């Protein structure tokens, strides 16, 4: 998937694949109905839409993290619920945000039309954490959420983040010379083929960025079932190095 081609596809998809705001709100209400840990917030976009975020404050904060989920999910779904609470437990306050969703029949390529919207959501989430006093802010993103974060870090002139964790990203990286913060690329040895096959290319690119590394979790699949403690350890080890106390 190339972003140059993606621009053309996105123009087409803007007409064929409008965001499903009703589905997004249903996901939000389902999330709120079962929420146990964290505080819900709403962030206001320029067009008037208000999207959900789940803020979990760390008792002894070492940094703050924006968490972005994969295609069609929600900020407390499965892996994302575990990550936002596990990271908060070890000192990283988390803001897990609702990313744009399309109708359930949409394919991954259809989501190219939502990347401008996801850029705005990342910017609002980072600004919100900064306003809460976050001095060191990272993005932790999974699957399509990682692809969206890649786009944000490339095309936003002032992304205002200090590190990026991409978990099981679903394509190769583009224009990495634009990214100036340490990057962790982590995926499973039994991950989706589109993630595994791009691993060598990603490693070659992130080696050019100081403080970056790649971790392959042996035996893990795309959602890291049975390997989430290992995943969390890898993320925390990276964040501790990339976001040193000041």
Protein language model features and the residues they cover:
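Alpha/beta-hydrolase active-site loop
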Residues: 108-132
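Short beta-strand/loop motif that positions the catalytic acidic residue
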Residues: 179, 185-187
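Short, surface-exposed "cap/lid" segments of acyl-processing enzymes
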Residues: 50, 56-90, 95-96
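N-terminal cap/lid segment of alpha/beta-hydrolase-fold proteins
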Residues: 19-59
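Catalytic histidine neighborhood in serine/cysteine hydrolases
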Residues: 206-223
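Short alpha-helix in the alpha/beta-hydrolase fold that links the catalytic acid
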Residues: 80, 181, 194-205
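Acidic catalytic loop of the alpha/beta-hydrolase fold
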Residues: 189-195, 222-223
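Gly/Ala-rich beta-loop-alpha elbow adjacent to hydrolase catalytic centers
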Residues: 140-149
């Amino acid at each position: 998937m190339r972003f140059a081609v993606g621009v053309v596809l996105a123009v087409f998809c803007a007409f064929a694949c409008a965001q499903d705001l009703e589905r997004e709100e249903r996901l939000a209400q389902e999330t709120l109905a079962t929420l146990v840990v964290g505080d819900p917030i709403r962030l206001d976009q320029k067009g008037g839409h208000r999207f959900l975020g789940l803020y979990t404050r760390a008792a002894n904060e070492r940094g703050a993290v924006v968490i972005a989920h994969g295609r069609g999910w929600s900020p407390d779904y499965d892996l994302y619920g575990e990550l936002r609470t596990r990271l908060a437990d070890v000192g990283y306050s988390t803001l897990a945000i609702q990313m744009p969703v399309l109708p359930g029949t949409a394919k991954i390529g259809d989501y190219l039309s939502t990347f401008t919207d996801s850029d705005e959501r990342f910017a609002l989430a980072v600004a919100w954490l900064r306003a809460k006093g976050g001095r060191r802010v990272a993005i932790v993103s999974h699957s399509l959420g990682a692809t969206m974060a890649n786009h944000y870090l490339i095309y936003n002139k002032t992304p205002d983040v200090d590190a990026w964790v991409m978990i099981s990203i679903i394509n190769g990286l583009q224009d990495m010379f634009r990214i100036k913060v340490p990057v962790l690329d982590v995926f499973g040895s039994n991950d989706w083929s589109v993630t595994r096959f791009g691993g060598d290319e990603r490693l070659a690119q992130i080696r050019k960025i100081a403080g970056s590394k790649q971790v392959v979790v042996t035996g893990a699949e795309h959602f890291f079932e049975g390997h989430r403690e290992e995943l969390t350890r890898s993320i925390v080890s990276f964040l501790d190095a990339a976001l040193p106390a000041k």
